[in-house]
């Protein structure tokens, strides 16, 4: 009896965890529908949900949505690969080498405090308004969280573990592979997760620079023709893609940190 009750309670808890994240979005959707139907929200300011669904379906059937999503996704992932790769490499360098930290960290921290929007005029002068400018902005945005969390992760590895490994003859690459990297990995993946979200934020900024394709182009073009429903579709697309990126990051954490107590079965991710 106790076992049955425990199993039922666990199943109910899992069901609640699956439902709970959707309660706030559903409440907002209901409030949105009520607001537009009662006239509290003007359809010129925010169209009713049904109009947004119709606009989305029209974009899907015409193929326009998928074409623009593919372009934006390619830009985002390529920018993430470049910026994240450089951030990881420099984070490892400054974390492992005091000389590299002295030479690079101060400069990187100064650049980090420059707002991305302030860089746009300079980026246009450097790269023009083609794809290079967009990729640079995305790469710049994702670079810093990956760099900072990699650097912090390396520096926060327990020194006693390193000394213990050395006492057993573990040195060089083996020390890095079996002690330093596993110890730093949780922090590195936090940076990756944050960077995956920031990737889409930077892409929104980047695609306002005279884009000829992509979700940003679709949204800006709709704004010119006062197609508010299409603008909302574009915003929701960014939100969905950002959520998918976060789900991917969580999955990556569970797979690569399956040995960590916080990510084992039954632990809160």
Which residue stretches match the model-derived regions?
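Transmembrane alpha-helical segments of polytopic membrane transport and secretion proteins
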Residues: 1-26, 247-269
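Periplasmic/extracellular loop-to-transmembrane helix junction in inner-membrane transport proteins
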Residues: 6-11, 38-84
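Transmembrane-helix boundary motif in ABC transporter permease subunits
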Residues: 78-108
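C-terminal transmembrane helix and the adjacent membrane-cytosol boundary/short C-terminal tail
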Residues: 98, 155, 186, 190, ...
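Short cytoplasmic-facing helical segments at TM-TM junctions of multi-pass membrane proteins
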Residues: 106, 153-191
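Generic hydrophobic transmembrane alpha-helix motif, especially the helices
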Residues: 109-145, 152-153
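Glycine-rich helix-loop "coupling/hinge" segments at transmembrane-helix boundaries
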Residues: 124-125, 154, 201-238, 257-267
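Transmembrane alpha-helices
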Residues: 136, 140, 173-205, 229-233, ...
